[in-house]
Design a protein with these regions (language model features):
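Substrate-binding pocket helix/loop in short-chain dehydrogenase/reductase
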Residues: 96-97, 104-109, 198
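Short C-terminal tail/terminal secondary-structure segment
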Residues: 144, 227-251
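Conserved Rossmann-fold SDR core element
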Residues: 81, 160, 170-184, 226-233
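Catalytic loop of short-chain dehydrogenase/reductase
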Residues: 133-171, 183-184, 237-239
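Conserved glycine-rich Rossmann-like NAD(P)H-binding loop of the short-chain dehydrogenase/reductase
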Residues: 28-43
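C-terminal substrate-recognition "lid" of short-chain dehydrogenase/reductases
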Residues: 209-233, 238
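Conserved glycine-rich cofactor-binding loop
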Residues: 12-14
Length: 251
């Protein structure tokens, strides 16, 4: 059974938007959380509603607990019950323990770990008996640690652990799984050449196809024998000794 009543954080752009498109279809309802991407969210809403979906946009800053709590309340009001939560949105800034500061720490931990925890808790209150899923978008770096992106890495390793422990807590009525992507879309700090060097340094020497991530989401939803698993979908980057920090490549 496919998901029918879905929440996607960071669903207006990049990986989140691609997942929304993958899961959309006739009678599918999706709440898309955005923060700074309203225009892109509106365009996506129009596109997906042409496929027969009902799309609801909500602005929320995942660093603010009051904003996070209103997402599930909004979704419940619009859709009744819920059956799928995709914790996709994240803050991704570079810091190191040597220049630790509370602002960066709080931004990452609040948006990338605390928000998914709150959303998962609230989501669990509004599901029916059946095929219910939480899918956390993590990062391959949880399998291949480096000292870079200090606060981000800690937030994602926390989300990795939460995927495992919440799968135990929410079973059998909610399955919880995660996807740990590698180099998929160039970020704003990277040049095209840096991004190319990054994915060419993976064992498969290829950029992660965003459709592969979407297909993995679909796989987790449909396969009712899987919970508590995190799939490294990274062209083998987590196996690699040629990580960006070794090669001197910007991330």
């Amino acid at each position: 059974m496919d998901a029918q009543k879905i929440i996607i954080t960071g669903g207006a752009t990049r990986i989140g938007a691609a997942i929304a498109e993958q899961l959309s279809g006739f009678k599918v309802q999706i709440v898309i959380q955005y923060n700074m991407s309203r225009a892109k969210g509106e365009l996506l809403k129009k596109k997906l509603e042409k496929k027969g979906s009902r799309i609801y946009l909500i602005k929320a800053d995942l660093r603010k607990e009051k904003d996070v709590k209103k997402i599930v309340k909004f979704a419940k009001t619009k859709m009744g019950y819920l059956d799928c939560l995709i914790n996709n949105a994240s803050v991704f800034d570079n810091d190191k323990i040597e220049n630790f500061n509370s602002k960066s720490w709080n931004n990452h931990l609040d948006a990338n770990l605390k928000a998914p925890a709150i959303l998962s808790k609230e989501f669990s209150k509004h599901v029916m008996k059946g095929n219910n899923n939480i899918i956390n978008i993590i990062d391959q770096r949880v399998f291949k640690l480096t000292p870079h992106f200090f606060s981000y890495t800690l937030s994602k390793t926390g989300l990795y652990t939460m995927t495992k422990t919440s799968a135990m807590s929410f079973a059998p009525n909610i399955r919880v799984n995660g996807i740990a992507p590698g180099p998929t879309i160039k970020n704003k700090r990277q040049s095209n050449s840096h991004f190319k060097k990054q994915y060419l340094a993976t064992p498969l020497r290829r950029q992660v196809n965003i459709n592969d991530i979407c297909n993995a989401v679909d796989f987790f939803i449909k396969n009712r024998s899987i919970t508590g698993q995190v799939l490294a979908l990274d062209s083998g980057q987590s196996l690699n000794w040629q990580t960006p920090d070794i090669l001197g490549i910007k991330e």
